[in-house]
């Protein structure tokens, strides 16, 4: 039973939506003792007065069981099972969504409208919050007036090649079937087959046209649609009306009130005041990605990009007022969280990944602030932080860690302990006051520090699931997700997390932190003090160590090594020792060979060969197949 349980659980882990049927002569064994979520289907005797034969399935009411006479000399009855369930694709409801239809006339009308608008009236008799809200509301109002909203249905089995002509032929076939005329039905089916072939060929030609016109984005979209590449099935949205509020509380669980004990930066002065120019704002608006979803303000990126010339002046005024007053309007730092299931089967709140939607205009503001922060940071700051730095990548971090270990292992009587630290929601636990104090100590001006402090505090947040929205919570902790400044701010927050012993190295890539302890003559005191120092640093900076996900590898090639080296504990909890660990995309093994990593990459390449075969079956041209192979398969080998 245990072997059967392990086999079934392994299959469900890989394909959570699959249907599993287990049938056989179980005698008096009960599969529900090890798989309680499976359902029995035989409730009548199969041999004399005993139920010895049984069928289990992970779907309830999937089949209707009935007895049949035994076959030949068998003393067991035969069993008949008739499907009594609807397939998953039939059980999924048709989704409807509203899309805005943009025309050239709509864009021109918006530009003309904003060109003649007197933006000064929005600032009269109100503060910066009211001024900004009025401007954004006016832009949204004008956008609604010049665009048309269209409601479309999205079916669970929607095919990319399905067009209006095929839909018309489908209706004609159904009409012919209901008419009862065999010849009409035969002709309608023939026309439908021809229409589908024509639609598929047209879709294929459209993908080829993207390839030959160097439209890489359109080409890859078509390829992914044809193959299902990176097409993750999302879980069904729960019908629980309280789930959005519950998730909002869960995502805000690290929030804490402002600490008055923390010394705040000195008030800003005009000496270090930042000033933005209209041409800078205009250039940033023109670089907006129009495909990004709008934030809570509802202003789409397409409006900001198309009307950059008309909106540059008013947003320059708002941005400079914000920098002058060191105040960020609440509407610019609000966020809507859209929970995305991490896996098909959601069992707990932690199975949802929060995806934050923030105003696009706020991202533009952040991009304008970013160069000022970078210019104030010393060039040699935190040389072992490899994230969000020019000319640095994950490969550099992996090379640093492995090179440090290998160089030490060349010496006699040495070994290396590598601790891969895991934080719980690291970005969400940053205390703004502590961050701003560190920025001030790094030489960033008091005006910018005060602005950043207000940017990180009193942030409205709500959760949206379908057509349901939670109540709003105000957050005062963490660097907001989906913002341009957050990654850099977090890397600056951890710049003082440095080793206290020269025999240890701390390699950082954002919140991925690794301690490389170089040990000689079995003296681990420096390494263990380093771990203790990191634990204390995390406690002082409100970062939560997740010991359960923290792993350790020991690299020891000594011939006379001890059989068992002492374990490592963090706050009384033992750290798991593993033989290999996936570090920034590379599997590092205790024997420092490439066997585990190579096997993983080969398996990944084999999986992607399936997509290549799907494209070949779609009769795509050879150059496009070669392009897909080089980008998706050859690149990982």
Q: What is each stretch, according to the model?
A:
Residues 31-32, 423-442, 513-539:
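Catalytic palm subdomain of template-directed nucleic-acid polymerases
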Residues 22-23, 28-29, 86-237, 287, ...:
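Arg/Lys-enriched, amphipathic patches
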Residues 11-14, 20, 369-385, 408-409, ...:
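Active-site palm subdomain of RNA-directed nucleic acid polymerases
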Residues 29-31, 47-52, 57-61, 66-67, ...:
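Short, conserved micro-motifs composed of acidic
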Residues 267-480, 517:
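Conserved pre-catalytic core of RNA-dependent polymerases
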Residues 105-140, 343, 573-637:
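Basic, alpha-helical interaction scaffolds
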Residues 86-90, 94, 119-122, 126-128, ...:
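Surface-exposed loop/turn segments and immediately adjacent short secondary-structure elements
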Residues 1-35, 41, 64-68, 74-87, ...:
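Active-site regions of metal-assisted phosphoester/phosphodiester hydrolases
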């Amino acid at each position: 039973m245990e072997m059967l349980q392990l086999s079934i659980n392994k299959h469900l882990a890989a394909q959570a939506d699959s249907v599993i049927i287990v049938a056989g002569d179980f005698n008096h064994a009960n599969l529900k003792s090890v798989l309680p979520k499976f359902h029995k289907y035989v409730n009548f005797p199969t041999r004399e007065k005993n139920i010895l034969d049984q069928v289990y399935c992970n779907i309830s009411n999937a089949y209707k069981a009935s007895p049949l006479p035994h076959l030949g000399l068998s003393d067991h009855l035969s069993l008949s099972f008739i499907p009594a369930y609807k397939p998953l694709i039939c059980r999924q409801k048709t989704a409807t969504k509203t899309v805005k239809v943009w025309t050239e006339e709509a864009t021109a009308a918006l530009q003309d409208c904003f060109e003649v608008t007197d933006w000064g009236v929005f600032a009269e008799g109100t503060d910066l919050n009211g001024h900004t809200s009025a401007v954004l509301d006016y832009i949204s109002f004008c956008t609604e007036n010049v665009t048309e909203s269209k409601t479309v249905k999205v079916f669970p089995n929607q095919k990319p090649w399905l067009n209006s002509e095929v839909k018309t032929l489908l209706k004609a076939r159904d009409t012919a079937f209901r008419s009862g005329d065999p010849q009409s039905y035969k002709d309608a089916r023939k026309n439908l087959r021809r229409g589908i072939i024509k639609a598929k060929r047209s879709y294929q030609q459209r993908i080829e046209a993207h390839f030959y016109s160097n439209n890489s984005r359109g080409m890859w979209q078509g390829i992914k649609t044809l193959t299902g590449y990176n097409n993750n099935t999302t879980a069904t949205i729960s019908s629980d009306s309280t789930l959005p509020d519950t998730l909002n509380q869960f995502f805000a669980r690290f929030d804490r009130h402002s600490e008055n004990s923390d010394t705040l930066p000195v008030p800003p002065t005009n000496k270090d005041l930042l000033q933005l120019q209209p041409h800078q704002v205009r250039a940033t608006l023109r670089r907006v990605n129009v495909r990004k979803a709008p934030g809570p303000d509802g202003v789409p990126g397409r409006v900001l990009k198309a009307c950059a010339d008309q909106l540059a002046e008013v947003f320059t005024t708002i941005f400079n007022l914000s920098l002058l007053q060191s105040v960020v309007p609440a509407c610019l730092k609000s966020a809507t969280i859209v929970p995305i299931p991490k896996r098909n089967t959601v069992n707990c709140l932690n199975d949802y990944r929060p995806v934050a939607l923030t105003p696009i205009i706020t991202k533009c503001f952040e991009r304008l602030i970013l160069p000022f922060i970078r210019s104030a940071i010393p060039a040699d700051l935190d040389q072992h932080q490899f994230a969000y730095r020019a000319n640095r990548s994950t490969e550099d971090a992996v090379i640093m860690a492995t090179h440090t270990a290998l160089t030490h292992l060349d010496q006699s009587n040495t070994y290396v302990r590598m601790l891969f630290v895991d934080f719980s929601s690291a970005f969400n636990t940053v205390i703004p006051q502590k961050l701003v104090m560190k920025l001030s100590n790094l030489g960033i001006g008091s005006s910018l520090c005060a602005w950043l402090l207000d940017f990180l505090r009193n942030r409205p947040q709500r959760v949206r699931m379908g057509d349901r929205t939670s109540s709003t919570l105000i957050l005062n902790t963490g660097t907001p997700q989906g913002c341009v400044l957050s990654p850099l701010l977090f890397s600056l927050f951890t710049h003082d997390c440095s080793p206290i012993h020269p025999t240890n190295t701390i390699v950082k890539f954002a919140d991925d932190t690794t301690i490389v302890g170089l040990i000689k003559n079995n003296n681990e005191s420096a390494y263990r003090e380093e771990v203790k120092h990191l634990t204390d640093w995390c406690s002082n900076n409100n970062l939560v160590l997740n010991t359960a996900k923290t792993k350790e590898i020991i690299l020891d090639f000594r011939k006379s090594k001890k059989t068992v080296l002492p374990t490592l504990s963090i706050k009384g909890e033992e750290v798991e020792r593993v033989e290999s660990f996936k570090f920034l995309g590379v599997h590092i093994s205790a024997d420092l060979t490439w066997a585990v990593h190579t096997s993983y990459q080969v398996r990944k390449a084999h999986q992607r060969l399936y997509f290549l075969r799907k494209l070949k079956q779609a009769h795509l041209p050879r150059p496009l197949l070669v392009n897909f192979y080089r980008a998706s398969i050859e690149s990982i080998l």
